[in-house]
Amino acid sequence: MLLEVRDLHVEFRTRDGVAKAVNGVSYSVDEGETLAVLGESGSGKSVTAQAIMGILDIPPGKITGGEILFQGTDLLGLKEDERRKIRGAKMAMIFQDALSSLNPVLSVGAQIGELFTVHRGMSRKDAKAKAVELMDRVRIPAAKERVGQYPHQFSGGMRQRIMIAMALALEPDLIIADEPTTALDVTVQAQVMELLADLQRELRMGLILITHDLGVVADVADKIAVMYAGRIVETAPVREIYKAPAHPYTKGLLESIPRLDQKGRELYAIKGLPPNLMHIPPGCAFNPRCPLAQDVCRTDVPPLFEVSPTRRSACYFWKETLDA
């Protein structure tokens, strides 16, 4: 197994109290596999990714339990200099806001090339040639002419391709893409997702795709983990999720996607708001918003029930959800 996250717990200590951002998250990604992690803002999906990468803000963040096994090594037991050697070379991350992630006063070629000068000891000339090669690989037109340009001279979609090029530079075994299509036009979103999928297949990387949009993962992911209030509430192969969700939250996410084949249908919206992570409701955190909630949901935290050999749902009424 390439990556295994086991019972991970992360909290943030603030003046107002302790926010439990990640509560017992477990998932895995193998070589050549794509896992989509879905959930609303504040669900813990990005915090989990930051913990995997070792870029969590500590303090106020703190990993309070669990294991993160990468190629059999527990990353949480490594020193910072050992983590740094893995970061970039073995695993890399694509952030959601390319403009703020790129240095505005350095050319894109210099920023891509820096990975080779720092990690591979290349000369600047050779690093620039590698930068051009990578820009070609991520389908940036006229890469040789544009390698000296600055981030503001590229469109949003092209900047995101530069971020992908930087993530691919050292040919890592795992890439984490955190909302890589945020703020992009729908057509550009599709192009970026297609590019990621093509590169993942070509290089046999593991890919974790973090998103709140079920619509962008249908043709890319192999399996899905749905998160809510710091917990995983459903995991399944992507086709099973789309065919029939086994958790009311997943069902709500699917029904809230606009569809062209259902003209005149009122667009569904999940009632209420995600909980305050400093005051998570007792029992199932989704119970105040759930149409199926019963007394047991308000008192007992549901485990991940086995729906099938490849599927789990943290809902006492997963059978009713499937049949609904």
Regions found by a protein language model. Give the residues of each.
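ABC ATPase NBD Q-loop/coupling interface
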Residues: 13, 67-85, 123, 194, ...
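P-loop NTP-binding/switch modules centered on Walker-like glycine-rich loops
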Residues: 40, 176-180, 184-265
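Conserved ABC ATPase "signature" region
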Residues: 67-74, 126-145, 254-255
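ABC ATPase NBD coupling module
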Residues: 75-92, 118, 240-245, 275-281
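Short catalytic/signature loops enriched in Gly
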Residues: 141-145, 235-324
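A short, proline-enriched helix->beta-strand linker immediately N-terminal to the Walker B motif
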Residues: 169-173
